[in-house]
Amino acid sequence: PHVVVDDFLNLELAQAIEKEFPGMDDERWYKYNNAIENKKALNNWEIFGPLTYNLMNYLNSPAFVSKVQVLLGDVILSPDFGLNGGGYHLHKSGGKLNVHLDYSIHPKMNLERRINIIIYLTEAWNEAWGGHISLWTHDEEKHQPKEMIEKVAPQFNRAVIFDTTCNSWHGLPETITCPDDQ
């Protein structure tokens, strides 16, 4: 299951959080560049600007977690203040993320991971550059992605909330073609 929420944040807040992102050349980014992915990520609370810090805190709060839990029924969710797999993510020109499964057991809490939330926060993004996340069904026999369920465009202030179980295939398989300065 998944849900796409446009205007996820107040517009002014989303614009202000976008301005808190570190620059593309900032040395604090953790760089991934391998056969599966080409991206940068940062999940250090000490580096977040104050608005991002408050947003991450809210997304891990009982108030927000209980709202998301409604989507899952009887599943009990726990917040992840360590932001394992979370935080800032940046895909520049040439970026990609092959269709994949995330790790399903949290490395520190030993709990099953259940939810991913992606919030697109690049207002000047042109949809023609790519960056669409694709969500796929699971092929039980071959243990691989089977059919694409949805391809979600990276629209500013759009959130994509989806399950991240051991069968939740997703990715950005098409190489991003934005200008180098975006």
Q: Where on the chain are the PLM-derived regions?
A:
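Non-heme Fe(II)/2-oxoglutarate
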Residues: 2-72
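Amphipathic alpha-helical recognition patches that constitute DNA-binding helices
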Residues: 4, 87, 116
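Conserved strand-loop elements at the edges of beta-sheets that form or border functional pockets
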Residues: 7, 90, 154
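Non-heme Fe(II) oxygenase catalytic core, chiefly the N-lobe of the double-stranded beta-helix
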Residues: 19, 58-113, 128
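Catalytic core of Fe(II)/2-oxoglutarate
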Residues: 94-95, 102-113, 122-182
